[in-house]
Amino acid sequence: RWIAPHPGRPHERPFYFDTGPSLITLPFVFEETFAAAGRKLSDYLTLTRLDPIQKYIWADGTTLSGRAMPADLAAELARFTQQPDEVAAFQRILAKGKMIWDESAELFLYHAPEQVLKGDGKFDPRRALSMLTIPIKIGMFANFAKWINREVSHPRLREVLYQYATYSGASPFMAPATLLVIPFAEYHFGGWYIPGGLYSLA
């Protein structure tokens, strides 16, 4: 019944539910895909930037909003944790994610491995040797939860960060620290929504 393999949209009239991705974090990927086909994304879809990107609610009524702007996010984290050190810790996690992005995006996002090996595309093959150290730099052999726990002590803020591993179906206690790139990408590039739900993209 559904066109796309991952996003689904079951419904209980009159409500529809996205069962796959709930937001877009790299809108430029879709813009470039449409451009490669000679089309403009904006002619087909309207992307709306979310603020907050998400809202966390605990059983006791405690809430945390993932605000889109850095200053607003810092203020919300300060309110939530009541600990300035925890705000700084969260920012260090995002900085780690940025480092992972900077080190790996060119190789893993912008170029397929076979392009690198064949010298295709814009990738500079002279950088290939230096990239042998990338797996260590980006935390491929480090543990996601342990890295978070080393920086963050607030138990619920840890929970918030743990759930980024579950985006890919992984356990935060078994996943590599490389997945810290996910919260960075979400807050740096923003969370975006398509009116009507992400199934509209399919």
Where are these predicted regions, by residue range?
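A short glycine/serine-rich beta->alpha loop
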Residues: E12-Y16, Y167-G169, G190-W192
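Short, glycine/acidic-rich beta->alpha junctions
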Residues: L26, M140, G197-L201
